[in-house]
Amino acid sequence: MEPFQTIRQGIIDRYSVLVDNPTEFAEAIHKPLKQSFRINTLKGDKENILEQLRNYDPEITEVPWNNNAYVSQLNNLGSSLEHFVGQIYIQELTSMIPPVVVKDVIDNNAILDCCAAPGSKTTQIAGMMQNQGHIIANDSRHARLKSLRGNLDRLGVTNATVTLRDFKSFPNTEADLYLVDAPCSSEGTIRKKNAVARMWKEKDYKRFTKLQKGLLNKACEMAPSGSTIVYSTCTFSPEENEKVISEIIDNQSVKVENIGINGLKTSPGITEWNGETYDKEVENCMRIWPHHNDTDAFFIARLEKC
């Protein structure tokens, strides 16, 4: 068996017990993803851009739960003129979820994107805000700032400030929304071969969990009462998802808000895994399984600071 097939089978074996339909889950893991993208209305009218894109692919389809997200049968839209000038942004559908679940709190507000590079969510939110309000786009790795700044510039974002700092030592900063799209084991991207194979070799849940808790604790500590904190990962691992949230509930004055998106099939967070029991509030978290919406896997929690 090829190494990547072994990786897939390991994921199927570990997580099939959590899903509603193990057969469909396994089939989805082996299917490649279609290319998805969103239209950047900072650089043009949506319908005009769509008309241009349909010259390449007449079968482009809108995603039912996000009226600015689309799926194409082509896999080379990243080479198109529309991508080059910033009218579209190639992005996995699940990566677009965090801004969608906080669209009620972003207008003209202050936002801190704690782990921003390469800028997928920063640019998405800037587009939703139409460059109003202010976004601090922080990342801890200098090597990733080039892609972050490049994407902000290409997409015409003017309301973002880029910072380079380990977020755990970031100065206390009041904001209305904190995004913690945390580094993770990336298991949920198994349908994209190259992204996962590299991460799977260092499958160290404890290491990631420690990092994730540090980032989320910092965001919760600096967040003022009434503000929103969103935590997300692209992994199946409960150790990096529900366990992190459960421990944050124990240590911070936060509550987990119940979230849902019309047109998107989701599952609640799990409360038991490998002999551990998590706080019942984690059921308000959102899990996305690959076989439910033909996407990557994803986890998201929306917290309110009390």
Regions from the language model: what does each represent?
Residues 1-306:
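S-adenosylmethionine
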